[in-house]
Swiss-Prot record:
InterPro entries: Exonuc_VII_S, Exonuc_VII_ssu_sf. The keyword Signal does not apply. HAMAP family: Exonuc_7_S. This is Exodeoxyribonuclease 7 small subunit. It catalyses: Exonucleolytic cleavage in either 5'- to 3'- or 3'- to 5'-direction to yield nucleoside 5'-phosphates. Pfam families: Exonuc_VII_S. One of its GO terms (biological process) is DNA catabolic process. Belongs to the XseB family. Transmembrane segments: none annotated. The lineage of its organism: Bacteria, Pseudomonadati, Thermodesulfobacteriota, Desulfuromonadia, Desulfuromonadales. Heterooligomer composed of large and small subunits. It is an enzyme of class 3 (hydrolase). GO terms for molecular function: exodeoxyribonuclease VII activity. Keywords: Cytoplasm, Exonuclease, Hydrolase, Nuclease.
Length: 75
């Protein structure tokens, strides 16, 4: 999964959720799918955290110049 892309992992996670919500899996199949889903969710979360750390915002100062600041999301 180390070389997997975020978009690929997210699509796999969405498919796992659809399969689990479908209700046609056995208990063993459901547990296996759930474990795989947790791995994909963790991978996606880590990728999003990495992306957030890399995002910077350009802020305009009073004197007209710009400064780069870390992105601070509204929570």
């Amino acid at each position: 999964m180390a070389t997997e892309k975020f978009e690929t992992a997210l699509k796999k996670l969405e498919e796992i959720v659809r399969r689990l919500e479908g209700g046609s899996l056995s208990l063993d199949e459901s547990l296996k799918a759930f474990e795989e889903g947790v791995r994909h969710a963790s991978f996606c979360s880590k990728k999003l955290d990495e992306a957030e750390r890399r995002v910077e915002v350009l802020l305009k100062r009073k004197d007209g110049s710009f400064s780069r600041e870390p992105f601070q999301p509204d929570e």
